[in-house]
Design a protein with these regions (language model features):
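N-terminal beta-alpha lobe that positions the nucleotide/phosphoryl donor
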Residues: 2-220, 224-236
Length: 236
């Protein structure tokens, strides 16, 4: 085994791949173990001739593209908070007013909850949106109805190419929904979920993994408000 201390960029990975491939055929690379950064460069790696192991770039897009993912949840008849997506300030304000405040605003394809904020009116939303657009890959902003006082749930699973799903853990956040998972504490096993809700969560995340055709790891973030379950996002 070898360990490389290099920037996690397409250029660095391609150079390392070429070097390793010269010593013997490399089957491909996994992009599921480093958060958003490797997911963002997956298509560049694939275009350069590198085989992406595990979840395909098409499946990654199904999870990461808000419109595609929203349509997927609708097809599965899975609840999601009211939401919209835009790269125009006026449209963002119109979407928020249609959804109803408070809203959660965040840029697409970023890691660590960067520029994620809760807006309670047009003035704060406009300010947050401008900041979020600066760090978004394509100036695209996601606007979700913020579920106040909701319980947030994190689920990690593994799925193989034959469709077998193993739930690694259902974790219940100590803080209410809206605090980024990297900044919050959680309980494993969950401390307030009944068996019926756990079964529903298990079915939903398994259905999503099968629909998207995840091969390998998948993280799902959900919220429970007034005993209703919602899917917030999926990270393959």
């Amino acid at each position: 085994d070898r360990l490389y201390f290099e920037p996690l960029s397409a250029e660095s990975v391609i150079e390392i791949y070429k070097k390793e491939n010269s010593n013997g055929k490399v089957l491909g690379v996994y992009v599921q173990f480093g958060g958003q950064t490797p997911l963002k460069i997956a298509k560049q790696l694939e275009k350069s001739g590198i085989n992406i192991l595990g979840t395909s770039t098409e499946a990654i897009d199904l999870a990461e593209d808000r419109d595609l993912f929203s349509n997927t949840l609708n097809e599965l008849k899975i609840n999601q908070p009211k939401n919209g997506i835009s790269n125009n300030i006026d449209d963002i304000l119109n979407i928020a007013n249609h959804i109803g405040y408070p809203v959660l605003v965040r840029p697409s394809y970023v890691l660590g909850g960067r520029a994620m904020e809760i807006a309670y009116d047009n003035k704060s939303l406009e300010s947050y949106a401008k900041t979020a657009m600066m760090v978004s890959t394509n100036n695209t902003i996601l606007i979700d109805k913020y579920l106040e006082n909701a319980t947030e749930i994190d689920v990690d699973l593994i799925r193989d190419s034959k469709g077998n799903v193993f739930i690694a853990g259902i974790m219940e956040h100590i803080e209410e929904a809206g605090i980024h998972s990297g900044d919050s504490a959680c309980s494993l096993p969950p401390f307030s979920l009944n068996k019926s809700m756990e079964n529903k969560i298990t079915k939903w995340v398994s259905d999503i993994a099968n629909k998207i055709n995840v091969i390998g790891l998948m993280n799902t973030q959900l919220a429970i408000k007034d005993n209703a379950l919602y899917v917030l996002e999926v990270n393959p």
